[in-house]
């Protein structure tokens, strides 16, 4: 394994679909471009696994919106792409962005253990396929760290979709935007779910996604020069994510989970509106001088 050549990318605040899009954004447009992936802070739950709501968007939607935010355009887009199809695409493009099942990715700790949508980059190499993945996370099976690996093409998973990403000229930085639904129904769904272990496992993933999204949004606002008083709020989100993981481990052992987890989630989701409120842009006042004139 070799390190990913994108040191400007803040991998620790990106999810597994965003992070490799971020690598290409900075590679094509320069350091910091990837932070525009955080321009739109959303809380819009949709139906998810185990009858629980999720904030995890469909990967294809996430790619298309994210690419537009950072000034990239998906080209040669294809669904259900086997390894030989990825190879054919890579022979026509500098690099291929793909999303597949993490269970089938030999470079990840999830390989053979956990199913989830996960992105990677693939290119040609004299020894086969060069895989690049900037995912950065601690998992139950060990750390996942950014890197490059070389595999025979047949070792690559079938992608649910794959494409090339082309730079868009004259791209303008997106303005910050919020779209935050009322959190009551979301929190109640986790509170009332009859399978406490399933709820605890899902909530661990949800808080991880929610926390990274808020860190990314704050980083983008600061990148634009805005002074955002969000440090303590973000620390509370970090603590909530850690508490959710502890709650999952306790639930797996048949032990009671911390009682304040869901009330704190509700409190933080409610506070997002004020902490991340987009204030109207106020241009600096223009100083004018008035010249005195004599009356005739």
Go through the PLM ranges and name each one:
Residues 20, 62-65, 85, 182-186, ...:
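Exposed alpha-helical structural elements
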Residues 26-30, 220, 278:
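A structural signal for alpha-helix termini and helix-coil/disorder junctions
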Residues 11, 53, 173-177, 201, ...:
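Charge-dense, low-complexity intrinsically disordered segments
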Residues 221-296:
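Charged, long alpha-helical assembly modules
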Residues 2-28, 34-160:
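Conserved active-site-adjacent core of cysteine acyl-enzyme catalytic domains
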Residues 128-223:
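Noncatalytic regulatory segments and standalone regulatory/sensor domains
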Residues 10, 176-180, 196, 233, ...:
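Intrinsic-disorder-associated interaction segments
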Residues 55, 163-165, 286-288:
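Hydrophobic transmembrane signal anchors and adjacent membrane-proximal interface regions, especially
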């Amino acid at each position: 394994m070799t390190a990913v050549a994108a040191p400007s990318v803040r991998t620790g605040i990106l999810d597994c679909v965003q992070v490799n899009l971020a690598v290409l954004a900075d590679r094509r447009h320069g350091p910091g471009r990837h932070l525009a992936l955080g321009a739109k802070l959303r809380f819009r739950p949709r139906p998810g696994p185990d009858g629980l709501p999720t904030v995890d968007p469909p990967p294809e939607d996430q790619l298309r919106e994210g690419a537009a935010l950072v000034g990239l355009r998906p080209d040669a887009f294809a669904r259900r792409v086997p390894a030989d199809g990825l190879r054919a695409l890579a022979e026509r493009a500098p690099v291929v962005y793909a999303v597949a099942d993490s269970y089938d990715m030999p470079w990840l700790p999830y390989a053979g253990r956990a199913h989830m949508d996960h992105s990677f980059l693939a290119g040609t190499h004299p020894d086969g396929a060069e895989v690049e993945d900037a995912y950065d996370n601690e998992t139950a099976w060990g750390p996942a760290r950014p890197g490059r690996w070389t595999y025979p093409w047949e070792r690559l998973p079938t992608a649910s979709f794959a494409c090339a990403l082309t730079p868009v000229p004259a791209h303008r930085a997106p303005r910050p935007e919020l779209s935050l639904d009322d959190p009551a129904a979301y929190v109640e769904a986790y509170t009332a779910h009859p399978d406490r272990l399933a709820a605890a496992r899902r909530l661990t993933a949800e808080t991880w996604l929610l926390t990274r999204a808020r860190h990314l949004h704050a980083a983008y606002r600061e990148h634009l020069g805005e002074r955002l008083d969000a440090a303590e709020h973000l620390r509370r989100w970090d603590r909530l994510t850690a508490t959710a993981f502890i709650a999952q481990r306790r639930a797996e052992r048949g032990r009671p989970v911390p009682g304040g987890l869901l009330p704190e989630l509700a409190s933080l989701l409610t506070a997002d509106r004020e902490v991340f409120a987009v204030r109207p842009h106020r241009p600096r006042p223009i100083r004018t001088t008035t010249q005195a004139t004599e009356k005739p």
